Amino acid sequence: MAESSDKLYRVEYAKSGRASCKKCSESIPKDSLRMAIMVQSPMFDGKVPHWYHFSCFWKVGHSIRHPDVEVDGFSELRWDDQQKVKKTAEAGGVTGKGQDGIGSKAEKTLGDFAAEYAKSNRSTCKGCMEKIEKGQVRLSKKMVDPEKPQLGMIDRWYHPGCFVKNREELGFRPEYSASQLKGFSLLATEDKEALKKQLPGVKSEGKRKGDEVDGVDEVAKKKSKKEKDKDSKLEKALKAQNDLIWNIKDELKKVCSTNDLKELLIFNKQQVPSGESAILDRVADGMVFGALLPCEECSGQLVFKSDAYYCTGDVTAWTKCMVKTQTPNRKEWVTPKEFREISYLKKLKVKKQDRIFPPETSASVAATPPPSTASAPAAVNSSASADKPLSNMKILTLGKLSRNKDEVKAMIEKLGGKLTGTANKASLCISTKKEVEKMNKKMEEVKEANIRVVSEDFLQDVSASTKSLQELFLAHILSPWGAEVKAEPVEVVAPRGKSGAALSKKSKGQVKEEGINKSEKRMKLTLKGGAAVDPDSGLEHSAHVLEKGGKVFSATLGLVDIVKGTNSYYKLQLLEDDKENRYWIFRSWGRVGTVIGSNKLEQMPSKEDAIEHFMKLYEEKTGNAWHSKNFTKYPKKFYPLEIDYGQDEEAVKKLTVNPGTKSKLPKPVQDLIKMIFDVESMKKAMVEYEIDLQKMPLGKLSKRQIQAAYSILSEVQQAVSQGSSDSQILDLSNRFYTLIPHDFGMKKPPLLNNADSVQAKVEMLDNLLDIEVAYSLLRGGSDDSSKDPIDVNYEKLKTDIKVVDRDSEEAEIIRKYVKNTHATTHNAYDLEVIDIFKIEREGECQRYKPFKQLHNRRLLWHGSRTTNFAGILSQGLRIAPPEAPVTGYMFGKGIYFADMVSKSANYCHTSQGDPIGLILLGEVALGNMYELKHASHISKLPKGKHSVKGLGKTTPDPSANISLDGVDVPLGTGISSGVNDTSLLYNEYIVYDIAQVNLKYLLKLKFNFKTSLW
């Protein structure tokens, strides 16, 4: 739901004389008409108004076509002022002469369009994305930059030809001409003439003075007399309504004090707002239309805001109510007896009536999109098609690459990107490891601009891999620096601060830290005792976080509100000097994953004062006492996040530094252990899922949190299938994102409102469960310094891992199984077997023993990310927890296998830059199979069935099956199964009891990716 507060512009009568005009810097007198553009605050996670005098507002270049719809507060103005705003907007804003924007005979100057000579060669045309050379004529449209909304309206530059091509999208109306551009008169004569030819104004035949300046709609011209009469009546009714409300407000100001007005609201069971004008508005609304009854959904207070009545209540402690209506329920407004002494109130008799709304606002209420469709800054691949993944991106190349510049340029352009020679204009840099290490002047510019550097292989991988663009950036990254890679933002067509482009899954705002490594390094340097001192305090080397009674006085709080689009954090620390009795309270706040925010450091008189102030702030922000054992979430209040302060970092570090120097394990096993315990791979996996590593580092992944998140997804799945209210979906989404902190940058957190979003988050939690196991193993266990870190980690897996001789019969059978069952449709890569390991998990054979006698046992494939294998080997293949939604899996919650190697290999999530994957072969006791052709969310197998088989159109040739240790190995080449009415291309096998699986082999595979580009 798009609330009125989402609007880019606001108009009102100045509540005081304190605000200064952003144009002329003069104060804006109290009660005078003022207008504002709403901009993202750089200091906190929210928007603030930039106020202007009415006349100054139009001079800075704001284009408004429909004030009724585009400007918050418009309908609360006096009628005459509404007409003033409308006429000024229709006339194109500021004029060549005068200040009102109306009444001048001079040609109107368009404040939001400009022409000038480029002052440098740094600007880029937003049409063709090419550089605009210094001294060239360039044209601009003032818009909100989706990447920097806090800057408000800024010039977005175009080549004249590109501007002409995008004329309609940019809102340069047919009747506008080049001579109306701001700065046109300063151009040379020949440039003026050229622009006049390119941008002629189309004049309507026989247009009379007083006709609309706006392009007149042909349909509007032909309006019937009946329709015109209807519009005229509505206009008169709106004017009469407005006059009545303002007459009452004017009289109330004369005869009633603010306290009197508050008492009137309380007597009529209405909430009392803050601010004199808001109180007056609500009393007048009640007197004219009746006292508002509580919201039917949450019993909250309804409040009029421009285009409708909005509920200000909360459905739950996590989510505000979304009710919005133009016809709220009311009762008679009652004036208490004691107020009848006031002559005006005694005489006032208003017939209860319904509020009338202009047709534009009625339409906007009906067409209001849900939060999930709200636009946000465009980011990587946000407007790219599948065959043009680098659309809107500019690529810089540095150093000697394996291909010449023309070849690289052709590759980039074929993928939708463009070459650039300037670091500060680049989205991405392609170079070599040698160039990064050399760090010449050009590379320093790249680092200064915080541009990620990736290897040349990235270009091949983009077309060959099924991974997301962000996964590929991470797989090929060469630089320790680099913010989230962004495309050039798609143009904002209307000046609303929103992009019409589809949102990218990985869209982000400016990131706060220069990559994960740097911020983590900073935190390690400041770790003292129980918690890390925030470096922004400036006291990381001279103070520590106070710990008293086993409780660390440090808190990180989170608050997500999808309706408002906020994703806020609040940090609070009590710091004690390392040497002296000095104490400080440090707090910081802002938007997760961006530079938006601020902080404050206060020195306190004593330890007691510091503790008291800390506890007061904590209670103010959360609604809970600091020492409270059971936390209760309150509406609009923050929720505490579990944060890893780095206590276990040293334990992890010991087990990842200089591994292999003392190991007694075979080299292939050593390499395998290093691979599955690679911390950087775990972090990359979390970043791919947009998890905020600052708020939820590896060390604080907990089963409790993940299981709670599964439960929320189950509720989401139920709510979606039952068609529950928007409020319930919102509530669940807010809870999920608060529990598992995500980094969305400047875009709104997306609603979890469909099966696909549930599926994606279920997959994320499945992977997080295994990452949690791996990291828990890393930081726990033996501290024996005499052992090699690899051997220590190997022992934690409780799995016997032996290298299979390449020349053995079983190795030959397995290689044949890989070769023969590679599906023809999985042709993006070939598979090469590097190592084969025979594995025996502790206790698994014993667990499998009852199923050893079951008929129909097969050796089948199971693929997974490398980050999941520590969990798989130490705990076995597991079934999703009871909390997980059953619809997150095609055939319900079970363990899935395949008889085609490439079907399972796709789940390894490899890429050209990271081509090594791991895959399992398990003995699976299938018994009697329940055969299915389409998705079925199995919760219990039919009687007499032991497993499910999803029937595919292709199956390994059964005549080629062989037996290995009494187990069937379906290693025949793929042939038609004869089953055509199925949704599956290849077979799937699912068991619902973990004891039916006995893992036998683990294969290390190299994915040799192909490409059709060269």
Curated annotation (Swiss-Prot):
Outcome of swapping K320A: Does not affect auto-poly-ADP-ribosylation
Predominant location category: nucleus
Regulation of protein activity: ADP-ribosyltransferase activity is regulated via an allosteric activation mechanism. In absence of activation signal, PARP1 is autoinhibited by the PARP alpha-helical domain (also named HD region), which prevents effective NAD(+)-binding. Activity is highly stimulated by signals, such as DNA strand breaks. Binding to damaged DNA unfolds the PARP alpha-helical domain, relieving autoinhibition.
UniProt-reported outcome of changing D993G: Abolished interaction with TIMELESS
Effect of L713A: Increased auto-poly-ADP-ribosylation
Crosslink (Glycyl lysine isopeptide (Lys-Gly) (interchain with G-Cter in SUMO2)) position: K192, K203, K249, K467, K486, K512, K528, K748
EC number per UniProt: 2.4.2.30, 2.4.2.-
Effect upon mutating C908R: <0.5% of wild-type activity
GO biological process terms held by the UniProt record: apoptotic process; ATP generation from poly-ADP-D-ribose; carbohydrate biosynthetic process; cellular response to amyloid-beta; cellular response to insulin stimulus; cellular response to nerve growth factor stimulus; cellular response to oxidative stress; cellular response to UV
Residues covered by region (Automodification domain): 373-524
Annotated effect of mutating S507A: Abolishes automodification on serine following interaction with HPF1, leading to delay dissociation from chromatin
Enzymatic reactions: NAD(+) + (ADP-D-ribosyl)n-acceptor = nicotinamide + (ADP-D-ribosyl)n+1-acceptor + H(+); L-seryl-[protein] + NAD(+) = O-(ADP-D-ribosyl)-L-seryl-[protein] + nicotinamide + H(+); L-aspartyl-[protein] + NAD(+) = 4-O-(ADP-D-ribosyl)-L-aspartyl-[protein] + nicotinamide; L-glutamyl-[protein] + NAD(+) = 5-O-(ADP-D-ribosyl)-L-glutamyl-[protein] + nicotinamide
InterPro entries reported for this sequence: ARTD/PARP (IPR050800), BRCT_dom (IPR001357), BRCT_dom_sf (IPR036420), PADR1_C_dom_sf (IPR038650), PARP (IPR008288), PARP1-like_PADR1_N (IPR049296), PARP1-like_PADR1_Zn_ribbon (IPR012982), Poly(ADP-ribose)pol_cat_dom (IPR012317)
Localization, UniProt: Chromosome; Nucleus; Nucleus, Nucleolus; Cytoplasm, Cytosol
Segments carrying motif Nuclear localization signal: 207-209, 221-226
Residue positions where N-acetylalanine is found in the record: A2
Record: active site: E988
Entry comment, domain topic: The two PARP-type zinc-fingers (also named Zn1 and Zn2) specifically recognize DNA strand breaks: PARP-type zinc-finger 1 binds PARP-type zinc-finger 2 from a separate PARP1 molecule to form a dimeric module that specifically recognizes DNA strand breaks.
Annotated function: Poly-ADP-ribosyltransferase that mediates poly-ADP-ribosylation of proteins and plays a key role in DNA repair. Mediates glutamate, aspartate, serine, histidine or tyrosine ADP-ribosylation of proteins: the ADP-D-ribosyl group of NAD(+) is transferred to the acceptor carboxyl group of target residues and further ADP-ribosyl groups are transferred to the 2'-position of the terminal adenosine moiety, building up a polymer with an average chain length of 20-30 units. Serine ADP-ribosylation of proteins constitutes the primary form of ADP-ribosylation of proteins in response to DNA damage.
Name by which UniProt lists this protein: Poly [ADP-ribose] polymerase 1
Lineage: Eukaryota, Metazoa, Chordata, Craniata, Vertebrata
Gene transcribed to yield this protein: PARP1
